A protein has these predicted regions:
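Amphipathic alpha-helical segments used for helix-helix packing
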Residues: 100-126
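C-terminal peripheral helix-coil segments that are non-catalytic and often amphipathic
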Residues: 1-6, 98, 130-149, 171-192
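Hydrophobic alpha-helical connector segments
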Residues: 64, 77-104, 155-158
Length: 192
């Protein structure tokens, strides 16, 4: 897979931006494998040659989509106001409530993409795995700074809580998510 410009937002041409924006909208709304390249090209208003200049294959586009979602998430966490480790954890998980609140939530884009790419050795799954490791490590570092006696275990539980909340918001009712975030944090962080 070609990784040209995949993580450098400044290097993104207008055509590439339209392709990524169109793919993001369609992949999220309809599913990755349900959307063909021809439709993405048509809706982005680019020539087929332009698509292939930026993405040698659809899998390259999917990888760029996953990497961009990862980059945006990391930037959002980095932009959170610096506060105590416990409040940072609450703010990070609180982003779940903010993400699902506007409506139109169709589940976590990473979990959705993973479901469509079952081969754990595929570049898409490796990118998702790197995202999950980063998320776990951020939580683990904050938990260690907060004095958690088993920060890796608690971080794994918080990742599982996050995954569950993202899917509950899609499958059940997003209005319950803020309460579940608060309750989950109270129960998991009370361990010390």
């Amino acid at each position: 897979m070609d990784r040209k410009n995949s993580q450098n937002p400044a290097a993104v041409t207008p055509a590439r931006r339209r392709l990524l924006d169109t793919a993001t909208r369609l992949f999220y709304a309809e599913g990755i494998h349900a959307v063909g390249i021809d439709r993405i090209i048509a809706e982005a208003g680019v020539a087929k040659a332009t698509f292939y200049n930026h993405f040698p294959s659809k899998d390259d586009l999917v990888l760029a989509y996953v990497e961009e979602q990862d980059r945006l998430g990391r930037e959002a966490v980095a932009a959170l106001p610096k506060q105590s480790p416990r409040k940072m954890i609450a703010a990070i998980l609180g982003r779940i409530s903010a993400a699902v609140a506007p409506g139109g939530w169709r589940g976590c884009p990473f979990l959705n993409a993973a479901a469509e790419y079952p081969d754990q050795n595929s570049p898409v799954r490796r990118a998702i795995g790197a995202r999950r490791k980063w998320y776990h490590d951020v939580l683990k570092q904050l938990l260690a700074a907060d004095g958690d006696p088993t920060p890796s275990v608690t971080a794994s539980l918080l990742v599982a809580l996050s995954d569950g909340l993202l899917e509950i918001a899609y499958l059940d009712d997003a209005k319950d998510v803020p309460t579940l975030v608060r309750e989950g944090l109270e129960r998991l962080l009370v361990r010390r």
